[in-house]
Design a protein with these regions (language model features):
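An N-terminal assembly and electron-transfer interface module characteristic of large anaerobic redox
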Residues: 1-455
Length: 455
């Protein structure tokens, strides 16, 4: 049975930190999750605006305009390492730069002028206008302005209702999915997608990961109608309702869109993970099994066997060097954490601490059932908790994002970036080897001999 941890934490957060008792344990304590951050806890979560921005950002032929202060735009500029095979308009940061006078008199004219100028200059396929806290507080009618500019310019101009004060980045995911749902299904013409077609939801082409996955899907005979939103195109998203299956990789950000498309268009969806050898193989098998095509299933078996054999020798060598090492994990979504635990276990690394910013009760129950005895599981944690627990559990490596990097280095431990700022592909079979190499080089770097750990 999962147990509460003895660490001194805020009273209202005690249900968000538990300790698992072992693999296969089904008698678990339900971790408290999916709730607003406790005041004073210094949460690592980002705001609603940031959540919507990271989801829509990879759509590379759309204009992304932030209606708010310049700080909001600069904070999220190039926020994902999402690559594009065509235009790179998404990598340019545009902002209406609301200031004191605009708060008094309104920013509507600034927004109209910015949209006119940018659409005329860059000729995007669509425009997303991100509402920020300031825009929401002064009451600009952004919806009306978007409708006006859409009629004037002839392209879709969409208000992303992402005022930061609404909640956390999880609420931003919902705002982004709501915006995407208004774009899906607007393509003219007949359905030209094949009977074995899918949409890739929640795969953001970080460091080219979408291309690695699509290469194998093409070999299986699967057509990818739209990447939502990795290497995304407005035209592809418009016709995404033609696909026969939605494959959801980042379930936290895209499950709501998948459910909506299931309701509106009858498209089923499956949750998969392309991180780690075991989960990557399962993802391709799940796709093949959905289409009930014996030929596709046989091709998939051959593909998986070939790719696994290609990487296993190196993974065994890395495991021999890392056996018994200990790692801590803190990422955005709990579904990703499940794959990371399995991937680390394959190279001999034990997970002693795992958590996420926006995990669900279902995913945390799964985490508790697969964790080793004594593993601490946290929801919506903060630097103090993460650093203290990492040191107490003897972690030698921290896997997280840009916010956790300085914390790990201050503790004198290795760090592996697994969030959206990274530049190395870690998905798929090839990505599994890259991840193992990253873990190995981080853990075995000679620099840690000279780093003094906090007492």
């Amino acid at each position: 049975m999962a147990q509460n941890v003895g660490l001194q934490i805020l009273e209202k957060r005690k249900g968000q930190v538990v300790q698992a008792c072992g693999i296969g344990d089904e008698d678990t304590v339900a971790i408290t999750c999916d709730k607003p951050s406790v005041a004073g806890s210094v949460s690592q979560r980002a705001c609603t605006y940031c959540g919507s921005r990271v989801v829509l950002y990879p759509i590379s032929d759309a204009l992304h305009l932030v209606h708010g202060p310049v700080g909001c735009a600069s904070y999220t500029w190039d926020i994902r390492g999402s690559l594009s095979s065509d235009r790179e308009l998404h990598r340019m940061s545009f902002c209406t730069d609301l200031r004191e006078n605009d708060i008094i008199y309104g920013g509507a004219n600034k927004l109209r002028g910015a949209l006119r100028e940018l659409i005329a200059k860059y000729k995007p396929e669509a425009a997303f206008v991100y509402s920020t806290c300031v825009a929401g507080l002064i009451g600009d009618d952004i919806d009306a302005i978007c409708r006006e500019m859409q009629a004037e310019t002839g392209i879709s101009v969409m208000n992303v209702q992402s005022e930061g004060f609404k909640g956390t980045k999880k609420d931003g995911y919902l705002a982004a999915c709501d915006t995407l749902s208004r774009l899906v299904g607007t393509a003219p013409g007949p359905n030209t997608a094949s009977d074995r077609s899918i949409n890739l939801l929640g795969e953001f082409n970080i460091a080219g990961e979408t291309w690695l996955i699509q290469k194998h899907l093409k070999e299986m005979g699967v057509e990818v109608v739209a990447g939502i939103t990795g290497d995304g195109r407005v035209a592809d998203i418009r016709r995404a309702h033609h696909a026969r299956l939605n494959v959801v990789q980042c379930s936290g950000s895209m499950t709501s869109l998948a459910k909506r498309m299931q309701k509106d268009y009858g498209i089923p969806f499956i949750r998969v993970s392309f991180f780690g050898l075991e989960d990557t193989a399962k993802a391709f098998y799940d796709i093949a099994n959905h289409f009930k095509d014996p030929g596709m299933l046989e091709v998939t078996r051959t593909l998986v066997k070939r790719e696994v054999n290609r990487v296993m020798d190196e993974l065994r060598r890395i495991r021999a060097r890392l056996e018994g090492k200990r790692a801590a994990i803190y990422v955005g979504g709990s579904f990703k954490a499940i794959s990371l635990i399995r991937a680390l276990r394959q190279i001999g690394v034990k997970t002693v601490l795992v958590g996420s910013q926006t995990g669900t009760a279902e995913d945390y129950a799964m985490l508790q059932s697969i964790c080793d005895p004594g593993t601490v599981i946290v929801d919506d944690s903060n630097p103090r908790e993460l650093s203290q627990l990492s040191l107490e559990k003897g972690a030698e490596l921290f896997i997280g994002g840009v916010k956790e990097r300085p914390m790990a280095y201050k503790m004198g431990m290795g760090f592996c970036d697994h969030n959206h700022e990274r530049k190395i592909p870690l998905a798929g079979f090839e990505g599994t080897v890259h991840f193992a190499r990253e873990v190995q080089s981080s853990l075995l770097s000679p620099v840690w001999k000279f780093a003094r750990r906090p007492l």
